[in-house]
C-alpha cells in the first residue's frame, strides 16, 4: 500500500483527471493505493491530511497478522520512512525492516513524497 503527497503526478500520468487532482488537492485528499500482485495500482481508501494517511498505512499493515518482513519504499521522505520503521519495530520486534527508494518508473507516477508500507506474512 502507498500514499502520495500530491495528486499532480497521477494526473500527469493519466491515472486521474486534472479536475480530480485539483479537487483532491484543495480538500487535502490523500489516497491509499493498493499495489496488486500483477503490479497494477488500485484505489483502496481516501483520507484527509498526510498524517492520517500515514496512520492508515500503519493500521493496514498491522492488520496482516504475524509478519516475516517489512518493506518501506519511499520517494525522498526518509523522515516518514524512519517513523514507519520505529512504529513497526515496536509492534513487531525482531522482524527485519527494509527501507528503500521507490524505483524510477513507479516514482514517475507517484511523485516525490510517496511512501509505501509492504509486509510479508509468515507462512502458516
Where do the model's predicted regions map?
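Mixed-charge interfacial surface used for oligomerization/domain docking
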Residues: 1-124
